[in-house]
C-alpha cells in the first residue's frame, strides 16, 4: 500500500478508497479487493503496477469512465475507476447504496485516521445494518442494483430499508433490460 501511496504522491493525485473494500474494512470483515477513485486513474494504475511488477488490466476504456485492475496477488485485486463528477461528493452521489457511497483519502486509510466523506449517511446505515438506496435515480439508472440490494442484505445480514424496497418494487420491470451476463455475474459473487 505504501507503493500505491507513493505512486499517487509522485503524480500529485488525490486518491480515495471507496466502495465495498472500505465498507468491509469498517465492518471488520476480511477484504481481499479494494476499490479506488481519482482523476488520472489510468496513469496511476499503470505506475503502481509497474512499481510492484504486477499486471494491470483495462476493464473499461470509455473516456471519463476508465476502470483498471491491478492484480496485486493471485487472490487480491485493486480496482481503479476515474472519478465521476467534479468532486468526490459528486462521485459518491452516483453510487448505488449509502453503504457503498463513502470515501476515505488513502493517506487517512493507511494511517488509521477517522476523516472520511459520507454525504448520504452510509456509516450510520452500517451501524443500523440497513441497505438504503442513495438519493436520486440510482436504482432506475441501473436496474442490476435491484438484485444487488438483495445480495448485500443476504451476505451482510442487513435489512433493506422500506423506501428502498418500495423503489425496487416500482422499478422491478427494469431488470428485463439488464444483460444476462451481468445478472449471472451478480448472482455468483
Regions found by a protein language model. Name each.
Residues 1-189:
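Catalytic cores of the polymerase beta-like nucleotidyltransferase superfamily
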